[in-house]
């Protein structure tokens, strides 16, 4: 899918935002005012390979910049579905994509691309987009939970993302469900995203409803016990996070929640009925993301613009020569 949002002057200043999920890879150019100039969507497997994922990623970015005439970005900002070091330089673990674990990805990409490079968890970019788009104040506490191939979690406190000691905070998808033994891609067993995220739905469709497209599972079989259990399991980590943080806002999103027939009202009722009373349960404010696939690109771009403004990234004057 290629979309030209508007005509633009090639002399204007822009950054490249990239959103890499377990399923889809999205890239786009965003000007300094936050306007999306162009975007392109592809499948993530095209940059995922055990031996040469970095080469594939660099080549993909370079090809996009040449083909769409964006050879001179101020920066490139990428959201990975990964656990990332606190200094946002290294990918610790990327369970749903091969070839990215343990890489000092920022230094590699900066050298290969020749421009400042920023990275963060993909869900941090999604939440940043929501905060900017909704005009939520810096003083507010906001948690975001986005359910796609896995379960992404972002925590924003006092205007900054909560990263934890090592940068691994917010791994809500690896919250353990008692008594569950299925092996997760992370190497542990019983992780909630193994039971209540997109990859589990793929398994349910394949094993239980082989004649049904995955996007029609809830529409056709939402009252089946296996899917009712899926929804209940998904509410458990959401309730836990609300009870722990007592946030001003909870933002829920991702492809699973926007599936046709997903029982959203029941899901929200499960959450509200199990949060601690009287607070945070009585007045927790739950907002739903609009699930626009461009949000991750824009959030990545906002992160780059913020980083360039505050000097988070070491500035490099050398422009990309490709």
Spell out what each predicted region is.
Residues 2, 7-75, 84-87, 107-115, ...:
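ATP-binding/phosphotransfer module of carbohydrate and carboxylate kinases, centering on a glycine-rich
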């Amino acid at each position: 899918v290629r979309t030209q949002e508007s005509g633009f002057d090639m002399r204007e200043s822009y950054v490249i935002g990239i959103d890499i999920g377990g399923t889809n890879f999205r890239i786009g150019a965003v000007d300094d005012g936050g306007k999306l100039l162009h975007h392109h969507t592809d499948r993530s497997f095209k940059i995922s390979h055990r031996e040469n994922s970095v080469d594939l990623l660099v080549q993909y970015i370079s090809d996009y910049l040449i083909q769409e005439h964006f050879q001179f970005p101020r920066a490139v900002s990428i959201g990975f579905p990964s656990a990332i070091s606190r200094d946002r330089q290294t990918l610790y673990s990327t369970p749903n994509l091969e070839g990215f674990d343990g890489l000092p990805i920022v230094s590699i990409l900066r050298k290969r691309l020749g421009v400042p490079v920023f990275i963060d968890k993909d869900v941090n970019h999604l939440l940043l987009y929501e905060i900017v788009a909704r005009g939520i104040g810096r003083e507010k506490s906001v948690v975001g939970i986005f359910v796609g191939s896995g379960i992404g979690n972002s925590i924003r406190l006092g205007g900054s993302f909560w990263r934890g000691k090592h940068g691994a905070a917010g791994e809500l998808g690896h919250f353990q469900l008692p008594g569950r033994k299925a092996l997760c891609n992370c190497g542990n067993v019983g992780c909630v995203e193994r039971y209540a995220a997109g990859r589990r739905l793929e398994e349910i469709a394949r094993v239980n409803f082989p004649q049904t497209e995955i996007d029609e599972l809830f529409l056709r079989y939402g009252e089946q016990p296996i899917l009712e259990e899926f929804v209940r399991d998904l509410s458990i980590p959401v309730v836990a996070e609300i009870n722990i943080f007592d946030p001003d806002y909870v933002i829920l999103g991702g492809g699973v929640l926007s599936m046709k027939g997903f029982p959203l009202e029941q899901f929200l009722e499960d959450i509200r009925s199990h949060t601690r009373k009287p607070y945070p349960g009585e007045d927790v404010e739950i907002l739903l993301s609009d699930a626009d696939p461009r949000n991750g690109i824009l959030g990545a771009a906002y992160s780059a613009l913020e980083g360039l403004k505050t000097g988070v990234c070491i500035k490099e004057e050398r422009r990309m020569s490709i």
